[in-house]
Amino acid sequence: MKQYLQVTKPGIIFGNLISVIGGFLLASKGSLDVPLFILTMAGVSLVVASGCVFNNYIDRDIDCIMERTKNRALVRGLIAPGVSLWYASALGVAGIALLYWAANPLAALLAVLGFIVYVGVYSLYMKRHSVYGTLVGSLSGAAPPVIGYCAVSGQFDSGALILLAIFSLWQMPHSYAIAIFRFKDYQAANIPVLPVVKGIVVAKHHITLYILAFMVPTLMLFLGGYAGYKYLIVATAVSVWWLGMALSGYKQAVDDSLWARKLFMFSIVTITCLSVMMSVDFQPDATPVLVSMLP
């Protein structure tokens, strides 16, 4: 049974659940519906697990080439490919049905869209054929917090849009950092990620620009009246520090692999801090800060 758990990538599920909690509690505004919270977490977990199993099935030919993925269950033959398809399908159907039944049709629809983008667009085509694969994949990576938010709100409003922007833009430097310190793996598997296709220097430029872009919706969550001043202080601190780490990559004597690994690790710190702060420093009434300042 261990291999059936591993193929769902528990680490990725856990990381996504942190963002789901952030979106859910932000929308809850202090009024927590515990059954809805638990069922939303379960539904998203099942859908993410399904996507990961499908990804393992699709990528088994390149996973055997890459050092970090060569011991995955499907590569080692611990799970038959056909069985993995049935397993992934069952997980996905269960997760989407649970979100539809326990939350609302919008949450289920967002899960379906995120799943289609990740499995159908990113994994099946973009990852192997386009340097823009990471950009497309970032949209699916941003789905969980938006699902958590919409499970409570029942609508895709400006708060949901801001969350989508925050988590999509965060994915880019996070993913490019991985591609830099795993450069040889991606190169050997012929995966056209930006650092391999355009070079590490160009990737550094993109990382810096995406972090700057990421800071805008991060600020908008405060200016839009969704989060408070404590959120603003923490979000600003981690974002500026992350940007500083990115800029340190331009030093001549820098070890690109070590720099990228540190940048990757801090990207996790950054998004975790944001998720925690939006969970605890929400605004009961989302009144835009700029509007509230008017006489």
UniProtKB/Swiss-Prot annotation:
The primary site where this protein sits is membrane
Q: Cite a GO CC annotation.
A: plasma membrane
Give the catalytic activity: heme b + (2E,6E)-farnesyl diphosphate + H2O = Fe(II)-heme o + diphosphate
A GO BP entry is:
heme O biosynthetic process
MF (Gene Ontology)? protoheme IX farnesyltransferase activity
Query: What stretches pass through the bilayer?
Result: 7-27, 34-54, 78-98, 106-126, 131-151, 161-181, 207-227, 228-248, 263-283
- Specify the protein's topology with respect to the membrane: Multi-pass membrane protein
Instruction: State its location(s).
Output: Cell inner membrane
Listed pathway(s): Porphyrin-containing compound metabolism; heme O biosynthesis; heme O from protoheme: step 1/1
Give the EC number: 2.5.1.141
* InterPro entries xref list: Protohaem_IX_farnesylTrfase, UbiA_prenyltransferase, UbiA_prenylTrfase_CS, UbiA_sf
Q: Family assignment? A: Belongs to the UbiA prenyltransferase family. Protoheme IX farnesyltransferase subfamily.
Miscellaneous comment text of the record: Carbon 2 of the heme B porphyrin ring is defined according to the Fischer nomenclature.
Q: What is this protein called?
A: Protoheme IX farnesyltransferase
Q: What is the originating organism of this protein?
A: Aeromonas salmonicida (strain A449)
